[in-house]
Amino acid sequence: MAPAADMTTAPTGVRSDEPPASAFSKPGGGLPVAAAMGGEEESDKPKVSPSPLPFSVEALMADRRKPPGGRDGPEGSGPPLGSARANLGALTTEAPTSPLPLGGHFPSVGALGKLPEDALLKAESPEKPERSPWMQSPRFSPPPPRRLSPPACTLRKHKTNRKPRTPFTTAQLLALERKFRQKQYLSIAERAEFSSSLSLTETQVKIWFQNRRAKAKRLQEAELEKLKMAAKPMLPPAAFGISFPLGGPAVAGASLYGASSPFQRAGLPVAPVGLYTAHVGYSMYHLT
C-alpha cells in the first residue's frame, strides 16, 4: 500500500517518477481505472430524453396548441423556417419518383423533428398526383367532342336566272280550263287572241297548255291501270288447282271395302271415269 500513500501525499501538478498504475490495480478509491474512464466518457455524452415522434398525434396536437412565435426547447433552437423549406424542396427535387433513396442516407429523426408542421401535414396527406408531362401533351389528350353539323340540303338547286312563277288569278285559271276542254292544241293565231283576252303573254299560255297536257296524260294512264286491275279475275293460285275425276276414289273404296263392311251405305250413281273432270278451284269459284 506504499504506492497509494505516495500518490496521495504527492502535491498536485508535480510529475511523479513512479510508473503509472496498471488498469488491473485498485486505486485508493476502490474502483478500477477503466470504469472511471468509462464514466467520464458517458458524462461527456449528452443525455437524450425520450421524446415523442414528431408525426404522432400527441406531437401534432402539442405543436398546434403552442403559439407560433414562442417555441422553446430543441425545436426553437432549430434552423429557421425558410431553410427547412429549402431543404425539403431539395429532397423532393432530387428523387421525385423514388419514395426511399437507394444507397443513400435516410433522414434522421432529429431532422424530421426540425421540419415545419405544414411539411409534415403535406407528407401525411398527399394531394392527388399531378398528371405526367406525357399525358399533358396534346397527342395523348382526348379529342374534343365534335359538334354534329346539320345535313346539307339535297334539294335540287334552281338556276339563278330562273323566271319567277306566274301567279294566275282564279278567273284566268277558269278560262284556261274551259279553253283546254274545248281544244288541247291552239294555233298561233288562237293563242295570240286568247292570251290578249286574258292579259297574259303567248309564252305563259303556251307553257300552261303544255303542263296541262302532261297532267291529263298522267291521269289517263292512272285510269287505265285501274281498269286493268279491276278486269283481272280473282282466281286462286295454280298450286291448289288439282284435277281428279269425280267419284274415282269413292268407287275404288266401295269396291275394296264393300264386302267386308256391314254398314255400307248405298252409293250414288257415279259417272264413268274420265267423263266429267273439273278443276276444283274453278268449280268452287263458279259455284259461289
Swiss-Prot record:
DNA-binding region(s) from the entry: 161-220
The family this protein is said to belong to: Belongs to the Msh homeobox family.
Record's keyword annotation contains Amino-acid biosynthesis: no
Keyword Calcium tagged: no
The organism's taxonomic lineage, starting at the top: Eukaryota, Metazoa, Chordata, Craniata, Vertebrata
Biased composition (Low complexity): 1-12
UniProt region (Disordered), positions on chain: 1-111, 123-152
SMART domains found in the cross-reference section: HOX
An example Gene Ontology CC term for this record: nuclear periphery
Domain of life: Eukaryota
Identification of the protein by name: Homeobox protein GHOX-7
UniProt keyword annotations, A-Z: Developmental protein, DNA-binding, Homeobox, Nucleus
Protein's cellular compartments: Nucleus
One GO BP annotation of this record: activation of meiosis
Coiled-coil segments: none
Major subcellular site: nucleus
GO molecular function annotations of the record: cis-regulatory region sequence-specific DNA binding; DNA-binding transcription activator activity, RNA polymerase II-specific; DNA-binding transcription factor activity, RNA polymerase II-specific; DNA-binding transcription repressor activity, RNA polymerase II-specific; p53 binding; RNA polymerase II transcription regulatory region sequence-specific DNA binding
Pfam families, per database record: Homeodomain (PF00046)
Cited PANTHER family: HOMEOBOX PROTEIN MSX, HOMEOBOX PROTEIN MSX-1
Role noted for this protein: Probably plays a role in patterning events during embryonic limb development. May also be involved in programmed cell death.
